[in-house]
Amino acid sequence: MASYFDEHNCEPTVPEEQYRQNALLELARSLLSGMDIDLGALDFTEWDQRLPPPAAKKVVESLPKVTVTPEQADAALKCPVCLLEFEEGETVRQLPCEHLFHSSCILPWLGKTNSCPLCRHELPTDSPEYEEYKQEKERRQQKEHRLECLHDAMYT
């Protein structure tokens, strides 16, 4: 007797794709039954598996240029990317998280990704899809927090 997969000329689903297929089936069932669905609960963007886009050009250009003070130079403050010490009077770039970098180190980095190499503080991007993903992720976290607070309030 032939197996189900041989009989239907198909391959078993790999576990990584199981969630996506289940989500698509759930969407199809909801549409066929005419039910209202929460499209926010279905995440087809898959940004978690992709690298974030580069930082917005306007944001990168507007990063403040800071002059290294004698105190910073005496403290042997280093660029976290190239690990060279900053010299007194040298002009460096400061990210919103207040980390300092050589321009020649941080500009190529921000041309590839939108976060600080040290603390992962994210800068805005020019990608509307990624910005929408970040907003949706924040909304989900807020919703989970509200539900947790409600649950805790019920059982305290």
From Swiss-Prot:
Pfam entry (one): zf-RING_2
The protein's annotated pathway: Protein modification; protein ubiquitination
Broadest EC class assigned to this enzyme: transferase
Keyword presence, Oxidoreductase: no
Listed Gene3D superfamilies: Zinc/RING finger domain, C3HC4 (zinc finger)
Zinc-finger ranges (RING-type): 79-120
Highest taxon above the source species: Eukaryota
Gene Ontology BP, a term: protein ubiquitination
Reactions accelerated catalytically: S-ubiquitinyl-[E2 ubiquitin-conjugating enzyme]-L-cysteine + [acceptor protein]-L-lysine = [E2 ubiquitin-conjugating enzyme]-L-cysteine + N(6)-ubiquitinyl-[acceptor protein]-L-lysine
Keywords recorded for this protein, A-Z: Metal-binding, Transferase, Ubl conjugation pathway, Zinc, Zinc-finger
EC number(s) per entry: 2.3.2.27
UniProt similarity note: Belongs to the RNF181 family.
Name of the molecule in the record: E3 ubiquitin-protein ligase RNF181
